[in-house]
Amino acid sequence: MTKRDFIDTNTYTKEEIQYMIDLGIKIKESIKNGYYPPLLKNKTLGMIFEQSSTRTRTSAEAAMTELGGHAQYLAPGQIQLGGHETIEDTSQVLGRILDIIGARVERHHTVAEVGKFAKVPVVNFMSDYNHPTQELGDIITMTEHLPKGKKLSDCKIVFVGDATQVCVSTMFMATKMGMDFVQFGPKGFQIKPETLKIGQQNAKVSGGSVTITEDADEAFKDADFIYTDVWYGLYEAELSEEDRMKIFYPKYQVNAELVAKASDHVKFMHCLPATRGEEVTDEVIDSDYSIVWDEAENRKTAMRAIFVYLLNPELRKAQASQAVADKYDAEFSLMLRNAVDDQRNAD
């Protein structure tokens, strides 16, 4: 079966994303019940990092270990990637040795090239364009915190601030799943027109919507989720932090005043790390409506789902046939249930 990469969620259907959401939650519940299904037994993940990382690296390593696999950390300087050896050659070699590759890169072209030449699945751990593993973790988190009586497609999410790769990814996932997406940000820091078109096309298919605005009342009206990111990103070198502060503060700081404009049941999200006192106040990030810690935990939930989905072709075959999907889902559920019962009996 043709290998699949997880480089851009726009190459996946809404149904495939929903399947990964459900798969991630199901595995998470199994582990919380004490059973670690060996779905990645004898599989090895190679992790290429051109940048430092906390959540991405630890969640990927833990996901592989918990499901019976192994992860190798490939730091800058430890491997040849576009240096003395071409990306093509390195990718082909790693594809012969590893079962799956994850790459956190400076430029999106790099991970796209790795995906092109490696014969194994490649996962984008973040580029200057998007952050798809964050996308899946976020949509899982929103699924777990849906307002009473609402589906994802009934919800509105507001991204506050700069059009970072996390902002772009939030638009991609929200519009893919039929949500209403709003970016509340200043001119010059809004999603680029060519990228915006992708979100608009997603929304046209799913029934969602995309809005870019500088009007706080318009942005936050009836919002179910508020999301923000740092104002000084990894890839921004044109302006100093001081200059960016003048643009974003105080209008685009998520504080109690802004939150009060949203719905009564609104939840706050942040991909982390957060610069407290800048893009968000302590009062908001530490509030009872903040779900940032669940969001961080679900980075691992997402990694499990992605790795299992890509390394188990029968899951992808199930997408083509509801009958096969139902059969596999029933067998998987029975396996987990029996394993948990066996573990309890052993205890």
UniProtKB/Swiss-Prot annotation:
Keywords in alphabetical order: Cytoplasm, Polyamine biosynthesis, Transferase
Positions bearing the site annotation: Important for structural integrity: 28, 144
Disulfide bonds: none
Cytoplasm listed as a keyword: yes
Residues reported to bind carbamoyl phosphate: 53-57, 104, 131
GO molecular function: amino acid binding; ornithine carbamoyltransferase activity; putrescine carbamoyltransferase activity
Metabolic or biological pathway: Amine and polyamine biosynthesis; putrescine biosynthesis via agmatine pathway; putrescine from N-carbamoylputrescine (transferase route): step 1/1
GO-annotated cellular components: cytoplasm
Sites where the protein binds putrescine: 270-273
An example Gene Ontology biological process: arginine biosynthetic process via ornithine
Localization: Cytoplasm
Pfam families linked: OTCace, OTCace_N
InterPro entries: Asp/Orn_carbamoyltranf_P-bd (IPR006132), Asp/Orn_carbamoylTrfase (IPR006130), Asp/Orn_carbamoylTrfase_sf (IPR036901), Asp_carbamoyltransf_Asp/Orn-bd (IPR006131), Orn/put_carbamltrans (IPR002292), PtcA (IPR024903)
Documented EC number(s): 2.1.3.6
Record field: catalytic activity: carbamoyl phosphate + putrescine = N-carbamoylputrescine + phosphate + H(+)
Origin: domain of life: Bacteria
Predominant cellular place of this UniProt entry's protein: cytoplasm
Similarity comment text for this entry: Belongs to the aspartate/ornithine carbamoyltransferase superfamily. PTCase family.
Record's function text: Catalyzes the phosphorolysis of N-carbamoylputrescine to form carbamoyl phosphate and putrescine. Is involved in the degradation pathway of the polyamine agmatine.
UniProt subunit comment: Homotrimer.
HAMAP family membership: PTCase
Record-given protein name: Putrescine carbamoyltransferase
Source organism of this protein record: Levilactobacillus brevis (strain ATCC 367 / BCRC 12310 / CIP 105137 / JCM 1170 / LMG 11437 / NCIMB 947 / NCTC 947)
Encoding gene, per UniProt annotation: ptcA
